[in-house]
């Protein structure tokens, strides 16, 4: 589906756009390595791979019902004519409502996806609504395959920026990579 991934995203990484920039100031490489070791152990415990083909994922969306997540901050960084959407741990429904109210037709430079890429916070409707080609997922676990399935079905030529290389560890079957 032509979705590329970049990792790790560490302090010192910069993204520039028309006179503006985003500079990543954390996490430090050492912190990332500690967490990466934990992830590696989790993967070893699970046999080192995630069985199941992404093309056979059952896509049943169950919305996040947490009041604290519903109250999570949704913010937009604006510089000149560029905008980056930060969604915190908010719900898909709240993000769609906020974007419809304040930025109904806006193209964002990037969107930081909510709640570590949780399938309960990322619906197909949200993926369709967010007008961008670059999404950030920050998580210390593997992203649920159903979220990647939703992206594959709803978006083309999308770049997912991740802080870990979880997908390189036999996460996909050969068919799932296609």
Residue positions per predicted region:
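Glycine-rich loops and low-complexity Gly/Arg-rich segments
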Residues: 32, 47-52, 99-101, 111-112, ...
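Binuclear metal-ion centers of metallo-dependent hydrolases, dominated by the metallo-beta-lactamase
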Residues: 1-23, 103, 131-178
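Short, solvent-exposed loop/turn segments at secondary-structure junctions
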Residues: 29-30, 91-92, 167
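Serine/threonine-rich low-complexity intrinsically disordered regions
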Residues: 53-59, 123, 163, 168, ...
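Active-site-proximal loop/helix segments of hydrolase catalytic cores
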Residues: 57-133, 137-138, 143-146
